[in-house]
Amino acid sequence: MNTNESALLIEIENYILEIYNRKSKPKDFYDDLSRLLIEFNGIYNSDYSYFGCIEAFVELLRELNICLGCQGELAQQLKNLSFKYIQCRFEFYVSRHKRKLRDHRYSENENTAQLVKRMRTVSQRYSRILVVRLDLAYKKKYHHSVDIADFDNDMRILRQRIHNQDGIFKGLIEYAWALEQGTEKGYHCHLLLVYKGHEHKNAYGIAERVSEIWKKITFNQGCYFNCHSPEYLNQFEEQGTLGIGMIHRNDPDQVGNMLKAIQYLVRPEKEEQYLRVKVCKRMRTFG
């Protein structure tokens, strides 16, 4: 695969939303639309489930009866469809897109509430817990060769290792993960691991060892961000909001900060982090 699937899907979504909001036909409208359709056709998989706006392109592909390899010919055929007609078609899918986004936000709120409940229970059960956070992604130079099936497969392997408590995962008392898609990061995962505080103390070291496992799973295409690096932790320590690392049950501020910090797992800074494609409708993005 030579196309960056993640970036293309975000570009298509932004394009459809832009066209939907236009008052008049933009310059090179048919050329841009034909280019995106051809690129989308190159990555399209009929077995996949596409989010919201992307479904508009799926329907257009089904209707077009010429070879999508010729952009000029496709642009000519698209000119038989007026800008207003295509804009109305997009409007239908944008409405569905907005409904799905509302459903997504509701699901995020539910996931957040469940995770907070689980972590509150853990913090009450143990006198101290070690909360480890890291982000797993792919090196930018490999984004063009990693599609949603690769990401799903890599995550399945990692989750199985966690579930089996192999190696560094031995002794886990709680864990959570969230799959996302971003403009810069591409496909990525926020990972939370929780250990008994009297058995483990080095959160940074654990995150580093997990990153090595991720690199092996991804054949060295994977990269990571260790949330326990001193530079990253210092900014939260200075603000008195540090909520990862060693958390003591008898310190209400630490527990409170921890419960706030873990919400980032399913509530990223930007709302546009949802997956635009899944290998199937029931593909899990949180657990």
Locate each region found by the language model:
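"Short basic amphipathic alpha-helical interaction patches in structured regions
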Residues: 148-149, 192, 205-208
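Signature for HUH/AEP ssDNA processing cores
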Residues: 116-176
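Catalytic "initiation/cleavage/transfer" segments centered on a nucleophilic residue
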Residues: 35-41, 48-74, 94-125, 197-287
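Histidine-centered divalent-metal-coordination microenvironment in nucleic-acid enzymes
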Residues: 174-198
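A short, flexible beta-alpha/helix-coil linker loop
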Residues: 139-143, 194-199
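Structured loops at beta-to-helix junctions and adjacent beta-edge loops in soluble globular domains
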Residues: 135-137, 180, 268
